[in-house]
């Protein structure tokens, strides 16, 4: 859940987001060490007038500063590729939901059900109840079962959009004429907020996404009430 003046990531609520947080910390530590080393060398160069003549043309030094960055890049690339393959893997999804982007709202269709689809519009600020989040509440939430793999099929009917839910590690482009897919799984119940993350016109910032993750029994009751 996001909170005011937040500087870090939202709490991870999916295995993918947990992996992304670990990868972020891993990469940040490497960048921090490299930056510290570079600043230290620069400070030494600026504060001393001595010159080490034997290192002005040394193949050993050139070999080190060629091989070492290559090793560092490999240490960054390997976990990154692992996460990319994890995000692309979809095995036997329990549910498929088709998401269509419009100017400026989202529509959802539960393809495993015969007639379960709806549009999701942002609730205007004037209609919010106490405790509601400004520019993030919608009239129809996407209710999904927790702890089950869900396939999201994402496209657009007009311009480029992007369907993103940060706490679940999701961000997939909605492209007219093309069907993209993403895997969604939540390890806990709750409300998860997102927004369109691709500039799509004057009301781009008024396209919120709200996922309500519930136990399977509650989802079955909700789906029966919607059909």
UniProtKB/Swiss-Prot annotation:
Binding site for Cu cation A2: 196, 198, 200, 204
Topological domains, Mitochondrial intermembrane: 1-14, 88-227
Domain of life: Eukaryota
Topology term for the membrane: Multi-pass membrane protein
Gene Ontology BP terms: ATP synthesis coupled electron transport
Cofactor(s) essential for the protein: Cu cation
Keywords of the record: Copper, Electron transport, Magnesium, Membrane, Metal-binding, Mitochondrion, Mitochondrion inner membrane, Respiratory chain, Translocase, Transmembrane, Transmembrane helix, Transport
All ranges on the Mitochondrial matrix side of the membrane: 46-59
TM spans (from-to): 15-45, 60-87
Listed GO MF terms: copper ion binding; cytochrome-c oxidase activity
Gene3D superfamilies hit by this protein: 1.10.287.90, Cupredoxins - blue copper proteins (2.60.40.420)
Compartments (UniProt record): Mitochondrion inner membrane
Binding site for Mg(2+): 198
Catalysed reactions, semicolon-separated: 4 Fe(II)-[cytochrome c] + O2 + 8 H(+)(in) = 4 Fe(III)-[cytochrome c] + 2 H2O + 4 H(+)(out)
One CC-aspect GO term: mitochondrial inner membrane
Residues annotated to bind Cu cation A1: 161, 196, 200, 207
Keyword Nucleus: no
UniProt key word Glycoprotein: no
Cofactor note: Binds a dinuclear copper A center per subunit.
Pfam families: COX2, COX2_TM
Enzyme Commission code: 7.1.1.9
Known role: Component of the cytochrome c oxidase, the last enzyme in the mitochondrial electron transport chain which drives oxidative phosphorylation. The respiratory chain contains 3 multisubunit complexes succinate dehydrogenase (complex II, CII), ubiquinol-cytochrome c oxidoreductase (cytochrome b-c1 complex, complex III, CIII) and cytochrome c oxidase (complex IV, CIV), that cooperate to transfer electrons derived from NADH and succinate to molecular oxygen, creating an electrochemical gradient over the inner membrane that drives transmembrane transport and the ATP synthase.
Assembly behavior: Component of the cytochrome c oxidase (complex IV, CIV), a multisubunit enzyme composed of 14 subunits. The complex is composed of a catalytic core of 3 subunits MT-CO1, MT-CO2 and MT-CO3, encoded in the mitochondrial DNA, and 11 supernumerary subunits COX4I, COX5A, COX5B, COX6A, COX6B, COX6C, COX7A, COX7B, COX7C, COX8 and NDUFA4, which are encoded in the nuclear genome.
Family statement: Belongs to the cytochrome c oxidase subunit 2 family.
Annotated protein name in UniProt: Cytochrome c oxidase subunit 2
Record organism: Oryctolagus cuniculus
Name of the gene encoding the protein in the UniProt record: MT-CO2
């Amino acid at each position: 859940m996001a909170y005011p003046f937040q500087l870090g990531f939202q709490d991870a609520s999916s295995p993918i987001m947990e992996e992304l947080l670990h990868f972020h910390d891993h990469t940040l530590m490497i960048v921090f060490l490299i930056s510290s080393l570079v600043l230290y060398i620069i400070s030494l160069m600026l504060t001393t007038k001595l010159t080490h003549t034997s290192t002005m043309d040394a193949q050993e030094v050139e070999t080190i500063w060629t091989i070492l960055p290559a090793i560092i890049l490999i240490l960054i690339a390997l976990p990154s590729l692992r996460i990319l393959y994890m995000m692309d893997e979809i095995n036997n999804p329990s549910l498929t939901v088709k998401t269509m982007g419009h100017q400026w709202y989202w529509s959802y269709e539960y393809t495993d059900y015969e007639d379960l689809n709806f549009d999701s519009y942002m609730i205007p600020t004037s209609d919010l109840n106490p405790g509601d989040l400004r520019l993030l509440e919608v009239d129809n939430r996407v209710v999904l079962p927790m702890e089950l793999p869900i396939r999201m099929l994402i496209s657009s009917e007009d311009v480029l959009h992007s369907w993103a839910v940060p706490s679940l590690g999701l961000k997939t482009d909605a492209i007219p004429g093309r069907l993209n897919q993403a895997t969604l799984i939540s390890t806990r119940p709750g409300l998860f907020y997102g927004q369109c993350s691709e500039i799509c016109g004057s009301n781009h910032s008024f396209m919120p996404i709200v996922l309500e993750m519930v136990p399977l029994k509650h989802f079955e009751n909700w789906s029966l009430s919607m059909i």
